[in-house]
Amino acid sequence: MTQVYFHRSNTKKVFLDHQGAVVNDLAEARDHATRLVQFFTNEHSLVDWRDWVLHVSDDQGDELFVVPFTFMLGKPH
């Protein structure tokens, strides 16, 4: 088990996750990251999420992987 953090950013803003989550492995971290991106993109707001990225880091601050929000949004119609 390891503590991972899910920071999100775009070209203008960075939001740091100070709480994080404990996960068993990278697959669980990926699933959690996917749920977070879905949560943010599904909320009713005026935010354009297309240039946002979720950065997943371990407790040492090393980036494990990134999830561009566009992966979850799909192609615009």
Go through each PLM region and give its residues.
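A generic structural signal for short beta-strands and their flanking turns/coil linkers
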Residues: 2, 19, 50-52
